[in-house]
Each structure stands twice: as C-alpha cells, then as structure tokens.
Regions:
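Active-site-proximal, substrate-binding regions of enzyme catalytic domains
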Residues: 1-92, 99, 110, 150, ...
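Acidic, PIN/NYN-like endoribonuclease modules and their adjacent C-terminal/linker elements
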Residues: 30-31, 57, 102-160
Length: 160
C-alpha cells in the first residue's frame, strides 16, 4: 500500500502507466482533497487522465479516505499535507513529486518517493524495459512534469 498525492497519479495516468501503482503496491490510498484535484477538477477541465483515475477508484484499487486530523503544513499544498497524514496513519510510503512536500514528509519520519521511483521499481520488477522507462519520463516531461537535470541524470544512472 502507498499513499499518493495528485501529481504522481496525474503524471502516470497521462502516459498510460497508472496501472504500475497497482502492480507494484497493490492498493493506493488517496485523501479526499487529492480526489477533488485529480478527478473532479480534471473532469471539469476535460482531462482524460481524470477518467483513468476515476476508473481505478471505481475498480477499488485506489481508495479514497478522509483524514480525521486536519493539519496545515506551511509551504505545501493541502493535498500533499493530507497525503503525508495518510501515509503516517497507514505507516506506508508517501508518493509525492513536489520537493517541499517530500521534505515535510521526511521530517515526519516517512519514506517519501516520487513518480520516477515508480518507473525505477517497474524496471527492477521487469514490468517495464529501461528504454520504456526513459521514453515514459520523456513523455511525462512533454506533458508538463517538471524535473531537474540532476534528478533526470540520477534516474538514468539508476536504471542502467
């Protein structure tokens, strides 16, 4: 099980790789704010990835859960903060792409990773080729995924 923020769900759904979360982690838990961000707002904007994420919720492998303890974290979005709280509650990995959110999660003692971790794990488990992972990252970047040159180079080094 993992707790995911909106960005990894959107990025992976846009490139047709959302299924990797189910293959690698079994169940994904998201908070209601993340559902609003990914599905409701996405559908309002006509984003096809919103329908892919909605189907995963309907299929039951992405579960929506409300965070009981509402807490505001300085410098990060509500969805990231709620993802951190869910990961803490379930004692699982938090999937967050934004660096500020990742730092807060780490400060709270959580193991935090991002979308590239999913692709790296998919290569390690034989679910995706190295070339396929590189093409997927390039496609994600083309769809608006922001990544530093340093992190991109590290990803390429890690999967080789």
């Amino acid at each position: 099980m993992i707790a995911s923020d909106a960005s990894p769900l959107i990025c992976l759904a846009k490139v047709g790789k959302l299924y990797l979360l189910r293959e690698l982690f079994g169940k994904v838990v998201i908070e209601e704010e993340v559902k609003r961000e990914t599905i409701e707002r996405g559908k309002e904007e006509g984003a096809p990835d919103a329908l892919v994420i909605e189907d995963a919720v309907k299929d039951g492998w992405i579960e929506v859960e409300k965070v009981e303890e509402v807490k505001s974290f300085s410098g990060i979005h509500k969805g990231e903060g709620n993802t951190i709280l869910l990961a803490k509650k379930h004692e699982c990995l938090a999937l967050i792409d934004e660096e500020d959110g990742r730092e807060v999660g780490r400060a709270m003692g959580l193991k935090v990773r991002g979308s590239l971790h999913v692709l790296k794990k998919a290569v390690e488990k034989g679910l995706m080729s190295k070339d396929g992972a590189m093409r997927t990252v390039d496609e994600m970047i083309g769809d608006g995924f922001r990544i530093s040159t340093r992190i991109y180079a590290k990803f390429l080094e890690d999967i080789r």
